[in-house]
Curated annotation (Swiss-Prot):
Positions of disulphide bridges: none
Main location group: cytoplasm
Enzyme Commission (EC) number: 6.1.1.4
Residue numbers covered by motif 'KMSKS' region: 618-622
Record's protein name: Leucine--tRNA ligase
CDD domains with a match to the protein in the record: Anticodon_Ia_Leu_BEm, LeuRS_core
Family label: Belongs to the class-I aminoacyl-tRNA synthetase family.
Short name of any one Pfam family annotated for the protein: Anticodon_1
Gene this chain is encoded by: leuS
């Protein structure tokens, strides 16, 4: 074999072998245990970044490991290729989104191949192709027929100048990104899928996700947000009107001093007809984007409507206020306000001089609401017939009374809202609904699917081409004129079922149930924790929809989930003449000085600018601290990049990019290459004969098999790839120091190397493939089996025992592995060093920890 490790040469040869032999293409095989390994597919932005490389390296390590376990492994890849960035790029580059997207796919596909990922490319999908989205459209029509799809008005960001809807990302400081016009909120009809119909099942089934991180499960539980409470009816004084309020704290009902309703509530709009101040407030609320996230931090404002609500139990009248912290699309659009026991209500009451009444007091201690509300549960007082009850007692008594009087009901509510899937954008899958001439809205007939998105378009940056082109919407259904829906699907739709399409990507149906049920559920899913509450919830929801449509048998889409951490890099900037920060790539920093703790104290870039170092932060375009994987692959080779990615940090934690660490990984591979090269150059004809081994040879062989056991557990069960690599590195140190003078010396090195290249194969497959062949194996490493631990090699002939006298180590003795306590005591007491410390004292106690420690207590 060649003496020098040449990554570009061997990686090209090995990748050609995989391509020519279709090594990673798989079909269903009832005789083999399957393993479906999937990393979240990328958006084709143009170039891979290190976050991609980390995600896909982890996936490839798991897939290759499982392959060597003898399993039938599916590892597919594709492209999440619809979305707003393509529209923006098309506008900037004066092209259409389609060619930009397809060009990026080709470029990134080659980058993935350069990194040596073992994908089944025959299953590649791109979600922007009609072959893919036709089945999404078909499924949507089936959901509509089942009553799981409906249309209602919902608020969107509206630019009055361009007369177009803006995505949240296109609103900058409350203004349109393009023309700087203040953005308004506008109610327009949109399509929704009833995810709330599955809220209880989605919540309960979280308990079955044993292989998912607790953090993700907690985030989903909170997002679904199940609560038990009471919905009650308040009358409106002086009218026959009434409205409903839901609360999880009916124990505080007797402390209500006002009611807050959303600006868009029918009662607010009614009162505004004779209240100009309220009308103005409602307009202001309409034009402010209020998400749930904003509610906690924004200033709480309100206007009295002049209306009064009638308390459902006491009959007392309390004022109704319109408030900006109540959302019409959340709950009933009205909340009962108990300032004595809710901090937000307390602050609002203080601001507007509204009464504050206490009705709950601590079980022990004094009640004090002079500075803040008392929000804990306690005992009721000032509550009439309910005085003295605790939370549970009051909940039941008040709920029972409201139910008995027909003024309320017990209710389970969910924080989860139905999924709004309409987007007023162009680059997405058209929603397959049509409006007939008489106004009836129906699904696009199956024989007219797919509704194809035209790709040869001109982007003007203002309106979606399919909205601007009035002819596109015109169609016919059963001989009647009709208009197509011009909204497109939320791109979370495509990523909610792609994993299932991989099972039968060429099928002339949404899924081939036989193939889908062979591969599903996914055995290992890998992606970022930032997807916990959106993609990963829709992913689970869609799987249940597919199940209920008879397309899959399982309840959940993925058995195990690994959420990899972010990749961080150093960030540097200087301030230019205009006072703006100019971020400099770490690759352009030529000089750095560090203090004795390794902190950067001075940095200069290639143009001589003195830089400010801001520390390690997430690789991003904005801070110009992204490292191009391709540059690193060209410099060090794909295996080095992969090895660094796996060794530098546990997979769930952040990874700090350090080129010195990459260089270290490269040196390790060169050491492995040299050890193999030196071994191959010798006469290795003598077979291993365990009966002939010396104690030193047995000890080395023991290290080999201990390493096999540790790496198998680290990769297979613990998924701690960094400690697996560390274990192999430690073994390599032993192997490099070991003699290769006798035939048995070399036989052990040979056994060790054939194990090491398989242990490292998932991580550095090109090197492992090549060395496997150079070591004389006739089969391909992909067809080999994972190394098996020889349990007999782990058995030790002798043990090293530490001997302590009065808690201090005085000697180390070697005893037979099966020596009993009496023998060990005798040897320990006879040791010269121990005798010295026992002279003239009486042994009071001897403690023996088998195989490890002999402790003597004497005085």
């Amino acid at each position: 074999m060649q003496e020098q490790y040449n990554p570009s040469e061997i990686e090209a040869l090995v990748q050609k072998h995989w391509h020519d032999n279709k090594t990673f293409e798989v079909t269903e095989d009832a005789n083999k245990e399957k393993f479906y390994c999937l990393s979240m597919f990328p958006y084709p932005s143009g170039r891979l970044h290190m976050g991609h490389v980390r995600n896909y390296t982890i996936g490839d390590v798991v897939a290759r490991f499982q392959r060597l376990q003898g399993k039938n492994v599916l590892q597919p890849i594709g492209w999440d290729s619809f979305g707003l960035p393509a529209e923006n790029a098309a506008i900037n580059n004066k092209t259409a989104p389609a060619p930009w997207t397809y060009q990026n796919i080709e470029y990134m596909k080659n980058q993935l191949k350069l990194l040596g990922f073992g994908y089944d490319w025959s299953r590649e999908i791109a979600t922007c192709t009609p072959e893919y989205y036709r089945w999404e459209q078909w499924f949507f029509t089936k959901l509509y027929e089942k009553g799981l799809v409906y249309k209602k008005t919902a608020s969107v960001n509206w630019c009055p100048n361009d007369e177009t809807v803006l995505a949240n990302e296109q609103v900058q400081d409350g203004c349109c990104w393009r023309c700087d016009t203040p953005v308004e909120q506008k109610e327009i009809p949109q399509w929704f899928i009833k995810i709330t119909a599955y809220a209880e099942e989605l919540l309960n089934d979280i308990d079955t996700l044993d292989g998912w991180p607790e953090q993700v499960k907690t985030m989903q539980r909170n997002w679904i947000g199940r609560s038990e409470g009471v919905e009650m009816t308040f009358g409106v004084a002086g009218s026959d009107k009434s409205f409903d309020i839901y609360t999880t704290r009916p124990d505080t009902l007797m402390g209500v001093t006002y009611v807050a309703i959303a600006a868009g509530h029918p009662l607010a709009e009614l009162a505004a007809q004779s209240n100009p101040e309220l009308a103005q407030f409602i307009e202001e609320c309409k034009n402010s984007t209020t998400s749930e996230a904003d509610l906690a931090t924004m200033e709480k404002r309100g206007v009295a409507t002049g209306l009064y609500a009638i308390h459902p139990i006491s009959g007392k009248q309390v004022p109704i206020w319109a408030a900006n912290f109540v959302l019409m699309n959340y709950g009933t659009g009205a909340v009962m306000s108990v300032p004595g026991h809710d901090q937000r209500d307390y602050e609002f009451a203080k601001k507007y001089n509204l009464p504050i009444e206490a009705v709950i007091k601590p079980v022990d201690g004094e009640l004090d609401i002079s500075e803040a509300a008392y929000t804990e549960k306690g005992v009721l007082f000032n509550s009439g017939e309910f005085d003295g009850l605790d939370f549970d007692g009051a909940f039941n008594a008040i709920a029972d009374k409201l139910v008995a009087e027909g003024k309320g009901k017990r209710q389970v509510n969910y924080r989860l809202r139905d999924w709004g899937v309409s987007r007023q954008r162009y680059w997405g899958a058209p929603i397959p609904m049509v409006t007939l001439a008489d106004g009836t809205v129906i699904p696009t007939p199956e024989d007219q699917l797919p509704v194809i998105l035209p790709e040869d378009v001109v982007m003007d940056g203002i309106q979606s081409p399919i909205k601007a082109d009035k002819e596109w919407a015109k169609t016919q259904v059963n001989g009647q004129d009709a208009l197509r829906e011009t909204d497109t699907f939320d791109t979370f739709m495509e990523s909610s079922w792609y994993y299932a399409r991989y099972c039968s990507p060429q099928a002339d149906q949404m899924l081939d149930p036989t193939k889908a049920n062979y591969w599903l559920p996914v055995d290992q899913y890998i992606g970022g924790i930032e997807h916990a509450c959106m993609h990963l919830l829709y992913f689970r929801f869609f799987h249940k929809l597919l199940r209920d449509a008879g397309l899959v048998n399982s309840n959940e889409p993925a058995k195990q989930l690994l959420t990899q951490g972010m990749v961080l890099a150093d960030a540097f900037y200087y301030t230019n003449d205009k006072g703006a920060r100019v971020w400099v790539s770490p690759l352009d920093v030529v000089t750095t000085e560090k203090d004795d703790k390794g902190r950067v104290t001075k940095a200069i870039d290639k143009d001589g600018n003195e830089l400010v170092y801001t520390g390690m932060c997430k690789m991003s375009k904005s801070k110009n601290n992204g490292i191009d994987p391709q540059v690193m692959v060209e410099k060090y080779g794909a295996d080095t990049v992969r090895l660094f990615m796996m060794f530098a940090s546990p997979p769930e934690l952040t990874l700090e990019w350090q080129e010195s660490g990459v260089e270290g990984a490269h040196r390790f591979i060169k050491r492995l290459w040299k050890l193999a090269s030196d071994y191959v150059a010798q006469d290795n004809s003598e077979a291993l004969d365990v009966s002939k081994l010396t104690s030193e040879q047995k000890a080395l062989r023991r290290e080999v098999h201990k390493t096999i056991a540790k790496v198998t557990d680290d990769i297979g069960r613990r998924q701690m790839f960094n400690t697996a690599v560390a274990a192999v590195m430690e073994l390599m140190n032993h192997l490099q120091k070991a003699p290769q003078t006798t035939g048995q010396d070399r036989a052990i090195i040979g056994e060790a190397l054939t194990a090491v290249v398989r242990l490292l194969y998932p991580i550095i497959p090109h090197v492992s493939f090549t060395l496997w062949n150079e070591l004389g194996n006739t089969n391909s490493i992909e067809d080999s089996q994972w190394p098996v631990v020889d349990e007999s090699a782990l058995v030790e002939d002798s043990k090293l025992i530490v001997v302590q006298v009065n808690g201090k180590v005085r000697a180390k003795i070697t005893v037979a592995a099966d020596a009993d306590q009496a023998s060990v005591e005798a040897l320990g007491m006879a040791d010269e060093q121990v005798i010295k410390y026992l002279d003239g004292v009486t042994v009071r106690k001897v403690i023996y920890v088998p195989g490890k420690l002999l402790s003597i207590v004497a005085n």
